[in-house]
Amino acid sequence: MITTINNKHKKLNVPNLRFPEFSGEWEEYRIEDITENISSGKSKCHSLNGKYNLYGSTGIIGKTDEPCYDGDLVLVARVGANAGFLQIINELCGITDNTLIIKPKNVDTQYIYYFLQYYNLNRLVFGSGQPLITGGMLKRVKVSLGTNKEQKKVATFLSLLDERIATQNKIIEDLKKLKCAIIENVLNSNHCTTLQLGDVGSYIRGLTYSSNDVVEDNGTLVMRSNNIVNGSPLDYKGDVVSVNKQISQEQQLQNGDIVICMANGSSALVGKSSFYDGECQSPITVGAFCGIYRSKMPITKWLFQTNRYRRYIWNSLQGGNGAIANLNGEDILRMQFPIPDKQIAERCTKLLSSIDSLIESNISLCSKFSLQKEYLLRQMFI
């Protein structure tokens, strides 16, 4: 059981949310006062047949024969786009030099790990070119501590929530694998006819607009690459652009449309697709770097989630010499897929729709757990 303390107008050094068996103020320290050392990793040897894990800034990157580190450690990504990323480990291992190592003393290591999540190390990152966090910065960070017993209970509580989030993510991944297996099984059955996407649908180009067309509200929503969540519903609620520009009836998104990223500076993003659920209350279309595939056959929605589709995209992008990787409408319309007969297609559509609904409900639940964790981090630390 957790009790809430109204500390809004008090100056006691205690968290807002605390287990009831603990009392007394917390003491403030610098990280350097509660650690044996903070230093960069020194492991350099990769070995294909190494016995020990070699950790980089965001996880295991290989193996090594020379374990240089042991014990409870918190790892912090030191440089690059992932600067500030946290890991917690306890094993014989190697650690590379793009990672800072925190070895606490007389303090619960998990507690420090969760405190740094609460603290948000991104606030320390500096450098316009290559983002960087230094050991000196970490040493000066101030942390308030209760007793070791209280630290342990807070850390254990939050780790249980992390385990629940990990379990939820595993459920989501397993459902996605099940969906993919069903799709591949159906397309490889003997009840299919091979057709081009152009035989059962059409391609619509996105809207071209300029910065002068952008308005704050009461315009047409324009979906871009960042709104496409691969294999999931189109995200038309976050980070959207609204323009004061007329669109054709054909360009207005319709329920069941597939929105495709057709061009991007990153080739890995080209070809990703989302489906539109038809529930946006505003006029809505896609930008010039995206396209719309429209078909009256519901099962085509899942063709864009197959390995065959990904292979088509990969092959279409080979040989390009432009700065921006891109597809064209004909690339989409020429793609060939085995299409099951009407009766099987209807059964598959119902089954796959049910799995999609289950995936979305589990994603929603996982998001709620993550929000709960964010709230607890804000309330259980100072």
Report each predicted region and the residues it spans:
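Amphipathic alpha-helical segments
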Residues: M1, N7, F19, E25-E27, ...
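Basic chromatin DNA-binding modules
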Residues: T3-I5, I31, V125-G129, L197, ...
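A short glycine-rich beta-alpha junction/loop motif
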Residues: K11, P15, G94-N98, G129-K149, ...
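Non-catalytic DNA-recognition/assembly elements of restriction-modification systems
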Residues: V14-Y55, N185-L207, R334, I339
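Structural detector for helix-capping/boundary residues
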Residues: L17, Y29, T58, Y119, ...
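DNA target-recognition patches
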Residues: E27-E66, G71-L86, S211-N244, E279
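A short beta-sheet element
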Residues: G56-Q117, F126-G129, T134-L138, R224-S225, ...
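Short, solvent-exposed loop/turn positions at domain surfaces
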Residues: G127, Y209, Q246-I247, N321, ...
